[in-house]
Amino acid sequence: TLRILRSHIFNWLVWPDFSSIPDRHNPFLCFQEMRVDEVAKLGRGRFMKALPALHTVPAVAYQLSGEGGSLVFSGDTAYSEPLIAAINDIPDLRYLLVETAFPDALHDLALASRHLCPSLLALFLERIKSNPEVWITHLKPSRARTTLEEIAGYCGRFSPKALHNGLELTL
C-alpha cells in the first residue's frame, strides 16, 4: 500500500512527496504501515490503533485515544461485523466518524461499492453499545441534504451530524 501511495499519489504529479519536505531527515510526513490491531504510540499518552474495515480495496478504520477518551474514524467502509465488534471493545469511545456515501435511493450502489447509505448506517449503529457523538463523513454534495434527512429518520438515538470544516474534537 505504501508503494502504491508513493507511486500514484505522493509522486510530485498528484501531490508533493511530503516524506521528503523539507528534507528526508526531517520530513513533514512519515509513512508507517499498520496492520489491523496494531498500535502506534503517538506520545503524551496518545495512541492510534488500526481497526478492521470492509471496502472494495484493503481498508482500515482508526482508533485515536488520549486522556479524554477515544475517537474512531472509519474512512470508506461497508457494514462490517468485525469493525462493530472492535468499536464495542472501546470502553471510552466519545466520537465516531463514519462515512455515509449515498442516499438510500442508491442502496444497491452502496452495497456494490462497499459504502454505507442511511439504512445500512442505521443497522451499523444499532449494534454500537456505547453512545458516542456520531459525525458523518463522505457525503456527496449534491445529495447531502437528502442523505442527512434520511440519517435523521433512521438514527435518532445518536443524532448524527455532518462533519464540517472548523470542527474540533478533543481527546
Residue ranges of predicted features:
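A short acidic, helix-capping loop that chelates divalent metal ions and anchors anionic groups
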Residues: 4, 104-109
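Charged helix-capping and loop-helix junction motifs
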Residues: 85, 111-120
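Non-cysteine beta-strand/loop elements that form the S-adenosyl-L-methionine
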Residues: 93-101
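Feature marks short, surface-exposed loop/turn motifs that line or immediately flank catalytic pockets
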Residues: 102-104, 143
